[in-house]
Amino acid sequence: MVPKLFTSQICLLLLLGLMGVEGSLHARPPQFTRAQWFAIQHISLNPPRCTIAMRAINNYRWRCKNQNTFLRTTFANVVNVCGNQSIRCPHNRTLNNCHRSRFRVPLLHCDLINPGAQNISNCTYADRPGRRFYVVACDNRDPRDSPRYPVVPVHLDTTI
């Protein structure tokens, strides 16, 4: 019985360690506020092809992000969406700070097509342009954010 207990404790520690590593892969780089990281990941008026556009994000994350959506609009326009009625976030149902855009915007959705890439310089993406509504989570600004916007987008929850 002792070996089984010992083995199960090691398995638990390994699992917790892996969860910590995976969680850190999704974390924003510490030098950015949540709003700044949102802008880097999701705002681009004229994004280049996905494989090129994703390099900046992947360089901060040190891995190939599976998918990403660039909204072809301005940060100020997304901030204005934060003023729309609050709704429960469709993909993260524990959050009630989401807001749906009133208008469709052009966007570029990127899907990783070589998930086994060992080096971030080899990440390759398929481009899926579109025009959709979007839902963002918004929070009060971080003291490091511009005081121009008291409430800022921090998470792209979904596109519709």
Swiss-Prot record:
<feature type="modified residue" description="3'-nitrotyrosine">
    <location>
        <position position="60"/>
    </location>
</feature>
<dbReference type="GO" id="GO:0061844">
    <property type="term" value="P:antimicrobial humoral immune response mediated by antimicrobial peptide"/>
</dbReference>
<keyword id="KW-0325">Glycoprotein</keyword>
<dbReference type="GO" id="GO:0004540">
    <property type="term" value="F:RNA nuclease activity"/>
</dbReference>
<keyword id="KW-0378">Hydrolase</keyword>
<feature type="disulfide bond">
    <location>
        <begin position="64"/>
        <end position="123"/>
    </location>
</feature>
<dbReference type="GO" id="GO:0004519">
    <property type="term" value="F:endonuclease activity"/>
</dbReference>
<comment type="similarity">
    <text>Belongs to the pancreatic ribonuclease family.</text>
</comment>
<dbReference type="GO" id="GO:0002227">
    <property type="term" value="P:innate immune response in mucosa"/>
</dbReference>
<dbReference type="InterPro" id="IPR036816">
    <property type="entry name" value="RNaseA-like_dom_sf"/>
</dbReference>
<dbReference type="GO" id="GO:0043152">
    <property type="term" value="P:induction of bacterial agglutination"/>
</dbReference>
<dbReference type="Pfam" id="PF00074">
    <property type="entry name" value="RnaseA"/>
</dbReference>
<feature type="active site" description="Proton donor">
    <location>
        <position position="155"/>
    </location>
</feature>
<keyword id="KW-0964">Secreted</keyword>
<keyword id="KW-0732">Signal</keyword>
<dbReference type="GO" id="GO:0006401">
    <property type="term" value="P:RNA catabolic process"/>
</dbReference>
<feature type="disulfide bond">
    <location>
        <begin position="50"/>
        <end position="110"/>
    </location>
</feature>
<keyword id="KW-0944">Nitration</keyword>
<keyword id="KW-0540">Nuclease</keyword>
<feature type="binding site">
    <location>
        <begin position="65"/>
        <end position="69"/>
    </location>
    <ligand>
        <name>substrate</name>
    </ligand>
</feature>
<feature type="glycosylation site" description="N-linked (GlcNAc...) asparagine">
    <location>
        <position position="92"/>
    </location>
</feature>
<dbReference type="GO" id="GO:0003676">
    <property type="term" value="F:nucleic acid binding"/>
</dbReference>
<feature type="disulfide bond">
    <location>
        <begin position="82"/>
        <end position="138"/>
    </location>
</feature>
<dbReference type="GO" id="GO:0045087">
    <property type="term" value="P:innate immune response"/>
</dbReference>
<feature type="site" description="May be involved in LPS- and LTA-binding">
    <location>
        <position position="62"/>
    </location>
</feature>
<protein>
    <recommendedName>
        <fullName>Eosinophil cationic protein</fullName>
        <ecNumber>3.1.27.-</ecNumber>
    </recommendedName>
</protein>
<feature type="glycosylation site" description="N-linked (GlcNAc...) asparagine">
    <location>
        <position position="119"/>
    </location>
</feature>
<feature type="signal peptide">
    <location>
        <begin position="1"/>
        <end position="27"/>
    </location>
</feature>
<dbReference type="InterPro" id="IPR001427">
    <property type="entry name" value="RNaseA"/>
</dbReference>
<comment type="function">
    <text>Cytotoxin and helminthotoxin with low-efficiency ribonuclease activity. Possesses a wide variety of biological activities. Exhibits antibacterial activity, including cytoplasmic membrane depolarization of preferentially Gram-negative, but also Gram-positive strains. Promotes E.coli outer membrane detachment, alteration of the overall cell shape and partial loss of cell content.</text>
</comment>
<dbReference type="GO" id="GO:0019731">
    <property type="term" value="P:antibacterial humoral response"/>
</dbReference>
<dbReference type="GO" id="GO:0050829">
    <property type="term" value="P:defense response to Gram-negative bacterium"/>
</dbReference>
<keyword id="KW-0044">Antibiotic</keyword>
<dbReference type="InterPro" id="IPR023411">
    <property type="entry name" value="RNaseA_AS"/>
</dbReference>
<dbReference type="GO" id="GO:0006935">
    <property type="term" value="P:chemotaxis"/>
</dbReference>
<comment type="subunit">
    <text>Interacts with bacterial lipopolysaccharide (LPS) and lipoteichoic acid (LTA). In vitro interacts with and insert into lipid bilayers composed of dioleoyl phosphatidylcholine and dioleoyl phosphatidylglycerol. In vitro, tends to form amyloid-like aggregates at pH 3, but not at pH 5, nor 7.</text>
</comment>
<keyword id="KW-0255">Endonuclease</keyword>
<feature type="region of interest" description="Required for nearly all of the bactericidal activity; partially involved in LPS-binding and bacterial membrane depolarization">
    <location>
        <begin position="28"/>
        <end position="72"/>
    </location>
</feature>
<dbReference type="GO" id="GO:0035578">
    <property type="term" value="C:azurophil granule lumen"/>
</dbReference>
<feature type="site" description="May be involved in LPS-binding">
    <location>
        <position position="60"/>
    </location>
</feature>
<dbReference type="GO" id="GO:0001530">
    <property type="term" value="F:lipopolysaccharide binding"/>
</dbReference>
<keyword id="KW-1015">Disulfide bond</keyword>
